[in-house]
Amino acid sequence: MYYILNPNVGLRSWWLVPYAYYIKGNRNAIGLKKEEFELLSLCDGKHDLEETPLLKRFVTAGMVKALCPCEAQSVSPDPWQKRECDNRYFPAMNWMITGKCNYNCLHCFNAADAAPLMSEFTLEEAEKLLDEAEKCGINAFTITGGEPMLHKHFFEILESIYRRGMFVEELNTNGYYINQEALDRMKAIGCNPLIKISFDGIGHHDWLRNKKGAEEDALRAIRLCVENGFHVKAQTNVHRWNLDSMLPTLKLLDSMGLYETRIIRTTEVPRWNQNAAGATLELQEYFDEMLKIVAEYIKEDHQMIVDIWQLMTILPRQKAYRIRSVECGIGEYRDSIPVCRGNRGMVAIAANGNVFPCLQMSGYYEAKNDILGNVKKDGLQPLLQAGKYLSEVCTTVGTLAEKNETCGKCPYFKHCVGGCRAIALTLTGDKLGVDLSKCLFYKKGYYEKTVSIMGDWVNHSEIQISKN
């Protein structure tokens, strides 16, 4: 009997991950045993295979289907369905296709100073990078800017991603260019990402975005995306001057049918420090104020998920929550865990081609002229084979514990696993420094305070606290 892979199944091999597959539209690859991979590789419509229990299991799972001999003669498998990648495994890319923006936000973490960013990928450069991404086994994209929809070839870039069998998982936008025509074109491409729209509080958005009418445009875009069936996530920066608007903003966004809102402490990146001295919430102040908002939010019936930066994610429909400072639960810690699992799985590329562990760190790296590599000059695959970039993102928490005595000796380290590298770098100037937000969270009892406020809601991040 002849068999062929389901069109949504793509086999992949990388260094250290030689046997895996993607399901089209899902970000991460799934590991296989050698014998499973080899059998699936033969499901190409050209090999007459014995109907083994393993093959029956693949048929039942919908991974392969049987063909009659006449069908097998005309089968031509999609090249997307099998690829060997001569590099380390990275399933995703966070791609700033342009640094240009119709706003000039006061807090932009992409900038090294207060000047607008003007670099971007040409269409030719974008096509070349996508060819390389396909070759390297990249599967999912977060498209960002600047304002990505300002790029004159925005839709051509989307089409090029889908033409190669990859997909856009998230789109970061200020919403200004979202209209019915744009959403219809995205649907025609098959592009249905989580659309993340910036909205920084009722009555405060125009100021932070440095653009009159930005608030009205953001709310219009949010409504239109929801009406068109897109999942929408609001990105909300909180600081001292808009703190009083947070709870009313959450209630408004929930009433509009948003899937999720993320509240982010506006952080001490170079541009924000220049533009808003005194507006940044101190870490303890931030935790205290956020817990007050949480306590009020859960008193009422809400549907919208609220993700509070470095504190917690509230899941109202499940009456559950996850504490963000708990990276590893009881017994989950391993020295081999990357210092940032997000960075290890997602290549971050700025509009000038520079690569970073994450784009939230890009302004700092640019200000220090700390260049880890550049895809326009070096290509993508060499950076995923060896060099400064790969070394940084593959650094493990075991190495962090060895290099950072404070973390290595901390009783909470195996739960926070060193915290966020972007925060540590911003606050200490050390890539392997202490994430002071995690120290504060654990040592000042914020785990216990959070659990107490949430009452009988299900805690998905239970740990045993020991202060000895």
Which residues does each predicted region cover?
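N-terminal [4Fe-4S]-dependent radical SAM core
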Residues: L5-G31, P53-N94
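Short amphipathic alpha-helical recognition elements used for nucleic-acid or partner binding
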Residues: I30-D48
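Canonical Radical SAM [4Fe-4S] cluster-binding loop centered on the CxxxCxxC motif
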Residues: D86-E124, C136
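Radical SAM/AdoMet-radical enzyme domain recognition
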Residues: L123-T144, H151-E282, Y286
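Short Fe-S-cluster ligation motifs
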Residues: L129-G145, V434-N468
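Short, small/polar residue-rich loop motifs at catalytic or cofactor-binding pockets
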Residues: V339-R344
